[in-house]
Amino acid sequence: MSRGKHGETVGSITAAFPHWFCKNYQKYAWKEETLPFDQHQLVACVAPRLCYITSGSEDRWSDPDAEWNGAKSASCAWELFGDAPLPSQPPANDSGYLTGRIGYHRRTGGHDITRWDWAMFLRFLDFHNG
């Protein structure tokens, strides 16, 4: 989520990586509260398809709490299609929620994609696709 988060902001990411974004997005740099939407609303547009979100517990720049809050907030869209919402609390480190069509895990560590992350991605897909 961009509003009220710690770590990476629209201003910092558009300054560091302007080529990743359209120029219009830069007008919200340092003014995230004026965005007409937030990231959980974009994630909700994926419903009812599968969606999987991950966090590293020590990745303060990406803000794992905001990533969890975004996943939890977006899960209401999957509820409209009969899925249970994500639980109210994030999973413990090195575990996750895989049974809903929106899944999430939090791994101990920083900004990375590890073998453990890949194993969790595959478990999520195996659960849903057999």
Where would I find each of the regions flagged by the language model?
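Short, proline-enriched alpha-helix->beta-strand connector loops that line the catalytic pocket
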Residues: 45-51, 98-102
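C-terminal catalytic histidine-bearing segment of alpha/beta-hydrolase fold enzymes
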Residues: 12, 16, 26, 72-130
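Mobile cap/lid helix-loop segments that gate and shape the active-site cleft of serine hydrolases
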Residues: 1-42, 67-88
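Conserved alpha/beta-hydrolase "acid-adjacent" motif
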Residues: 35, 60-70, 114-117
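Conserved strand-to-loop "acid loop" that flanks and positions the catalytic carboxylate
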Residues: 47-65, 107-110
